[in-house]
Design a protein with these regions (language model features):
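Feature for extracytoplasmic/surface-facing segments of secreted or surface-associated proteins
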Residues: 29-281
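Sec-dependent bacterial lipoprotein signal peptides
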Residues: 1-27
Length: 281
């Protein structure tokens, strides 16, 4: 009798432990699905695959000319935001910078986009002598339009830095937007940069147009009486480096140095003088 009782107790204990293990496993899986963390990055509600998605948009510094190249890169399903090597390609359809990418299938909803081409200058109406590349980082799970512009380019490095340091994607994008707009003197404009279009009349759209025009003058013009980025080395590499370096300097702290003095030794110091002057710094 005692042996039967011990046997029943042992069987009950094994059954209970098995149930506890399964419940613990289920909770762990639930937590992982709720917030996927990999490589130091933080994702809002897990990574979701994308099937048969179509994305349209416009590329604007000024508007990119017809035939400019667009590349959409898939990022890893592990939440690291690293490219997998899978890419989708398009070209702008007109001199308005419009593009469309169809039949997108991805293992993650988070994508990197790069647009490369000449653009119509905001200040002169002429096409640029140099091609430039602008980037954007986006979650396409609930959007079918992504616009690529100078603000998405500047936001890119900062948002990635924040994600890799524990922010969710949504938090990182929101913080990067806020920091950049405050840097430019716009404190109450919180629109997603991918939604902005210089052809539209909203307040944030107009802010993008003004910011883009100022950058055009510092990159190619004679806005502040110093040497523009193109003339520093008389080549196009300096033009691209000017906006890339600005984004990198901003990426870790969420602000630019308070004084141009700290950038005097920078290879593009005249570009920064121009930028700081119209920022009023």
């Amino acid at each position: 009798m005692k042996r039967d009782m011990y046997k029943m107790f042992a069987e009950c204990l094994v059954f209970t432990l098995a149930i506890a293990f399964l419940l613990g496993f289920a909770v762990a899986c639930s937590d992982s699905d709720g917030k996927d963390v990999a490589g130091g990055s933080s994702v809002d509600a897990g990574v979701a695959a994308i099937t048969d998605k179509n994305i349209a948009g416009v590329v604007q510094k000024g508007p990119f000319v017809k035939g400019s190249n667009i590349v959409l890169e898939e990022t890893s399903a592990d939440g690291s935001f690293e490219p997998t090597g899978k890419e989708f390609f398009a070209t702008t359809r007109s001199d308005k910078g419009d593009f469309q990418i169809d039949d997108i299938n991805l293992e993650s909803q988070f994508v990197r986009l790069t647009a490369t081409g000449y653009y119509k200058r905001e200040t002169t109406g002429e096409n640029t002598v140099c091609q430039i590349s602008l980037r954007a980082l986006s979650d396409i799970s609930n959007r079918d339009q992504i616009n690529i512009n100078i603000l998405t380019h500047l936001e890119y490095d900062r948002a990635l830095y924040l994600v890799k340091n524990g922010k969710t994607f949504a938090e990182a994008k929101k913080q990067a937007r806020k920091e950049w707009m405050e840097q430019f003197g716009y404190k109450n404009l919180a629109d997603d940069f991918e939604n902005l279009d210089i052809a539209n009349g909203g307040k944030a759209d107009k802010a993008l147009e003004q910011i883009s025009a100022h950058f055009d003058e510092c990159m190619f013009g004679e806005y502040c009486g110093t040497i523009c980025a193109y003339e520093i080395n008389n080549d196009c590499k300096s033009v691209q480096a000017s906006i890339d370096d600005l984004a990198k300097i901003f990426s870790t702290s969420g602000k630019l140095p308070s004084s141009i003095d700290s950038l005097k030794q920078h290879r593009l110091d005249d570009f920064f003088k121009c930028t700081y002057e119209w920022m009023g710094k």
